Amino acid sequence: MCDASCDEEIISRRTPTFSPKLFRKSRELSPIKPVRTPTPPAPTPPPMCFSEELQRKFQEKKLLPVYDD
C-alpha cells in the first residue's frame, strides 16, 4: 500500500498551485467596488378609499394622450 508521503504527493498534484503573481494581477484588474448604502424603502402612500382610487385612475386616463389612427 501507499504510505502517507505518497498520498500527500497525489493531493498536491491534484490541487492547482496558488500563484501569488496571478492573484496580484487579478486584484489589479478588478478594483474594490464601493459598498452601496442600502436605500430606504419608499414610503407607501396612505390607503385610499375606493372612489378616490377610481377618480385617480380616471384622471390618469384623461391625461394620457389619445392617438387616432
Swiss-Prot record:
Residues 37-48 have a biased composition (Pro residues). Residues 22-48 are annotated as: Disordered. It comes from Autographa californica nuclear polyhedrosis virus. This is Uncharacterized 8.0 kDa protein in EGT-IAP1 intergenic region.
